[in-house]
Regions:
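Mature, folded catalytic cores of secreted/periplasmic enzymes
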Residues: 9-13, 17-21, 68, 87, ...
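Generic hydrophobic/packing signal
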Residues: 3, 28, 35, 42, ...
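Glycan-recognition surfaces
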Residues: 1-70
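Intrinsically disordered, low-complexity peptide-like regions
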Residues: 5, 22, 36, 84, ...
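Carbohydrate-binding surface patches
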Residues: 58-61, 66-68, 104-131
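Generic structural hydrophobic/aromatic packing signal, biased to beta-strands
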Residues: 2, 40, 60, 82, ...
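Low-complexity, compositionally biased segments
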Residues: 10-12, 23-27, 41, 73, ...
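Catalytic cores of secreted or luminal carbohydrate-active enzymes
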Residues: 53-104
């Protein structure tokens, strides 16, 4: 595991910057070697929708899911996001491939796809970059 850039902060622009840095590094990610866009900012001031998008994209990037919030005082919404077993399963898929952008159907929209273990299995995310 290695960091790919700067320290993240709890702002949507910082989350986007981390995603943009990681976007072209898929060939370096895989079992035993992970691109680390930094810890999660979920529950630290982003909106609930931004928190969901942030957590989901870290999973699509096969990034380490390291909670940066105070788990002793997190809200029920934050806990639900951080413990979403389906999203965690995508992140932890044993194939370990990082998602890539496969289409940009609009100014602020990206479609990401990630190959998963199993026959012809993929995770797909529609990522809205807008706030």
């Amino acid at each position: 595991m290695w960091r790919i850039g700067f320290d993240i902060n709890p702002s949507w622009s910082s989350v986007l910057s981390c995603i943009d840095l990681d976007k072209n590094l898929a060939s370096y990610a895989g079992p035993g070697h992970w691109n680390d866009p930094d810890m999660l900012e979920v529950g630290k001031g982003l909106s609930a929708d931004e928190d969901r998008a942030h957590f989901g994209m870290w999973a699509m990037l096969a990034a380490p899911l390291i909670a940066g919030n105070d788990i002793r005082s997190m809200s029920a919404t934050t806990k639900a996001i951080l413990t979403n077993v389906d999203v965690i399963a995508v992140d932890q898929d044993p194939l370990g491939k990082q998602a890539t952008v496969v289409a940009t159907p609009g100014t602020n929209l990206e479609i990401w796809s990630r190959e998963l273990s199993g026959t012809n299995t993929r995770a797909v995310a529609l990522f809205n970059r807008s706030e």
